């Protein structure tokens, strides 16, 4: 299980980066930082199971914060954690398919969303995708 304090701090940093320098530069900054962190300690989980566990931890911690980070900071933080473990995944951005003005950010592994609602593939159309392993 992930410690709440570092995750909460990371969510605040990612949220601030997005607000100050925008999405593209925030994504680059998060990838840059993930590449410079010390190697992760041994984990019992790997691949998709690890991604699902980390996503649940991020969501649980984010829901307790007073500012409630939305999907983009959560997805960027999960992307950084997966990049650090060299787990192939994609950061995705999409828009609602029903015509409502709404966007969403999520992580996919092998084309399947990680820790998302079952209707995500039909509710949102993917507009942008980037591998978390690409620089």
Residue ranges and their predicted role:
Residues 57, 74-135:
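Hydrophobic/aromatic-rich core segments of domains that either
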Residues 1-44, 59-67, 84-85, 89, ...:
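N-terminal accessory/pre-domain segments preceding catalytic cores
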Residues 33-50, 57, 102, 110-112:
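Intrinsically disordered, low-complexity N-terminal segments that are enriched in acidic
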């Amino acid at each position: 299980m992930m410690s709440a304090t570092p995750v909460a701090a990371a969510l605040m940093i990612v949220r601030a980066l997005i607000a100050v320098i925008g999405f593209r530069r925030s994504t680059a900054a998060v990838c840059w930082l993930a590449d410079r962190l010390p190697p992760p300690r041994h984990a019992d989980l790997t691949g998709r199971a690890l991604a699902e566990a980390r996503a649940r931890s991020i969501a649980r911690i984010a829901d307790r914060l007073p500012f409630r980070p939305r999907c983009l900071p959560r997805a960027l933080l999960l992307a950084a954690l997966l990049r650090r473990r060299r787990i192939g995944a994609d950061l995705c951005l999409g828009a609602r398919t029903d015509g409502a003005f709404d966007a969403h950010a999520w992580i996919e592994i092998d084309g399947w969303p990680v820790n998302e609602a079952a209707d995500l593939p039909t509710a949102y159309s993917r507009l942008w995708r980037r591998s978390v392993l690409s620089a």
